A protein has these predicted regions:
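Conserved glycine-rich FAD pyrophosphate-binding loop
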Residues: 17-144
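A conserved active-site cap/scaffold subdomain adjacent to cofactor or substrate pockets
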Residues: 1-23
Length: 144
């Protein structure tokens, strides 16, 4: 909960429950929480979605999904192909980033491929800021 002190207090009293320790939030931030332990063949994905997006139709056990930011950010542990996750996110107006690309062979970028217009802007910006292509070549996208 966040907001003014009296608003947070009133909402907390209405909702009930117990406050979580700062350790929980730090473990979550640093991906040290037990949720982030992967099984053989699983990759860790961060799905970024518009607020109020309902559950995506994915063949993933609910225990392998961690909802954050009111559901706008979802951590998913799965062996599903990258295209399956990215297509589902795109249909919902979001995108997916793989945090463990080595788990999927590391052959592709962890980031959602750019459409032609956005890629043009990326290339032009990179050309302006890094004319000699020395800063992290291929780091975000293999093509530049």
């Amino acid at each position: 909960l966040e907001g003014g002190e009296s608003s947070v207090k009133a909402t907390k009293e209405r909702l009930g429950g117990e406050a979580l320790s700062a350790d929980f939030w730090q473990q979550l931030r640093d991906q040290q929480h037990g949720f982030f332990s992967l099984n053989e063949g699983q990759a860790l994905w961060r799905l970024s979605l518009p607020p109020h997006t309902p559950a995506l139709e994915l063949a993933v056990d609910e225990s392998d999904i961690f909802y954050d930011w009111g559901g706008s950010q979802r951590w998913v542990k799965t062996a599903l192909p990258a295209d399956t996750l990215r297509d589902a996110c795109q249909k919902a107006g979001g995108h997916a980033t793989c945090y463990t690309p080595h788990a999927q062979g590391g052959a592709e970028s962890p980031f959602t491929p750019l459409n032609a217009v956005v890629e043009k802007y990326h290339r032009n910006l990179k050309a302006e800021l890094d004319a000699h292509g020395i800063f992290n070549p291929g780091r975000l996208y293999a093509a530049f």
